[in-house]
């Protein structure tokens, strides 16, 4: 299969997202084309380093680039001040300057943290995203959102800092555990649910084959990236339309916070439950027929994904506490909760006109 290129047109901050097989092996060639950086430093995590760092270093060495690497602990808990500080001080020790390059090799956690480190290092250093999870390839590596978590909520500390290049090698996705692959699928399904019913129908027919069929996998990643790139081009800093990409995230982030950002609930699993809850709330409010949430829940179940709060193992805070966690969501304006709801599959919109009684009802019925 050929390599697909999706161009993200943001004027001086424009860049390409390259999608296909074998991109890790040709990363050196792709990176040298970026006006030849003098120094390159890699931020990754311990799990990804064991799987993919040797291939990346070999590719860079083939172009005469030596690249030191720092491997941080794997997992959402790494998106914190302590690990950010460690990464920044290490980059300074490597004497990375503005015209040099930071490579983020990993999933969404590493991409977010490395991008934020690059944003604040010397007031802005270029960086390249090499996403190694399905979630990162279709969502977090594209669009320039970088940051870390706070004990008060997810992604509350960060900056917009666009990458110089994204290399999405679909072959590396074969090293993911089935659970991690399914978690990433939560973000893929989100694109169909928020703005493209035809894509959701395609997923209903083909998603079961994504893990084993590289052609299907490449098509799903490309279409997801095309949808996100279009939205980012029209609303880079989330003043309006880009908020639609947060479908499922108001619920999902609260649930992630409630589980302590642990492996009890992966981000994509939280998004899946959040999408199901958003459609249930939409139906309860009379915005769409009950057929829509039933279809969403059925598809998530068919993919082996959680769709209810009851699917999360262990104890959780009560509904009032969950609503309190939602109040820390980035979309809150003037103290009012804002939700991405839907008039049907592929017809999402943002609103703060949500009946608290119906919200509590939806949460209670999901337990």
Swiss-Prot record:
Binding site for NAD(+): 108-112, 132-133, 145, 154
Pathway: Metabolic intermediate biosynthesis; chorismate biosynthesis; chorismate from D-erythrose 4-phosphate and phosphoenolpyruvate: step 2/7
GO molecular function: 3-dehydroquinate synthase activity; metal ion binding; nucleotide binding
Cofactor(s) of this protein: Co(2+); Zn(2+); NAD(+)
CDD domains membership: DHQS
Keywords: Amino-acid biosynthesis, Aromatic amino acid biosynthesis, Cobalt, Cytoplasm, Lyase, Metal-binding, NAD, Nucleotide-binding, Zinc
Xref: InterPro entries: Dehydroquinate_synthase, DHQ_synth_AroB, DHQ_synth_fam, DHQS/DOIS_N, DHQS_C
Places the protein is found: Cytoplasm
One GO cellular component term noted in the UniProt record for this chain: cytoplasm
EC numbers, comma separated: 4.2.3.4
Entry-linked Pfam families: DHQ_synthase, DHQS_C
A GO BP entry: amino acid biosynthetic process
Amino acids binding Zn(2+): 187, 249, 267
Protein's job: Catalyzes the conversion of 3-deoxy-D-arabino-heptulosonate 7-phosphate (DAHP) to dehydroquinate (DHQ).
Protein name: 3-dehydroquinate synthase
Organism name: Paracoccus denitrificans (strain Pd 1222)
């Amino acid at each position: 299969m050929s390599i697909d290129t999706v161009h993200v047109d943001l004027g001086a901050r424009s860049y390409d997202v390259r999608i296909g097989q074998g991109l890790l092996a040709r990363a050196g060639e792709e990176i040298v084309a970026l006006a030849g950086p003098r120094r390159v430093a890699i931020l990754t995590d311990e799990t990804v380093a064991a799987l993919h760092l040797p291939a990346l270093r070999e590719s860079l060495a083939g172009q005469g680039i030596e690249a030191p690497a720092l491997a941080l602990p794997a997992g959402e808990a790494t998106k914190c001040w302590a690990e950010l500080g460690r990464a920044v001080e290490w980059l300074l020790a490597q004497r990375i300057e503005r015209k040099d390059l930071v490579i983020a090799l990993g999933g969404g956690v590493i991409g977010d943290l490395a991008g934020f480190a690059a944003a604040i290092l010397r007031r802005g250093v270029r960086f390249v995203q090499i996403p190694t999870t399905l979630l990162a390839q279709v969502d977090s590596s594209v669009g320039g959102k970088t940051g870390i978590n706070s004990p008060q909520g997810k992604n509350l500390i960060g900056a917009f800092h666009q990458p110089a290049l994204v290399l999405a090698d679909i072959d590396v996705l074969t090293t993911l555990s089935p659970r991690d692959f399914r978690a990433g699928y939560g973000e893929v399904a989100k694109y169909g649910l928020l703005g493209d019913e035809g894509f959701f129908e395609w997923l209903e027919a083909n998603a079961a084959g994504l893990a084993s069929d590289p052609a299907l996998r490449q098509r799903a990643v490309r279409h997801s990236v095309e949808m996100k790139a279009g939205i980012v081009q029209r609303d880079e800093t989330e003043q309006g339309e880009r908020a639609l990409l947060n479908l499922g995230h108001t619920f999902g982030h609260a649930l992630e916070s409630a589980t302590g950002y642990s492996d009890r609930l992966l981000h994509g699993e939280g998004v899946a439950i959040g999408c199901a809850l958003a459609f249930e709330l939409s139906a309860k409010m009379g915005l769409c027929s009950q057929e829509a949430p039933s279809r969403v829940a059925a598809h998530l179940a068919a993919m082996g994904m959680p769709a209810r709060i009851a699917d999360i193992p262990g104890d959780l805070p009560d509904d009032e506490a969950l609503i309190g966690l939602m109040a820390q969501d980035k979309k809150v304006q003037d103290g009012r909760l804002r939700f991405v709801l839907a008039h049907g599959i592929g017809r999402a919109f943002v609103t703060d006109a949500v009946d608290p009684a119906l919200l509590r009802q939806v949460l209670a019925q999901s337990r």
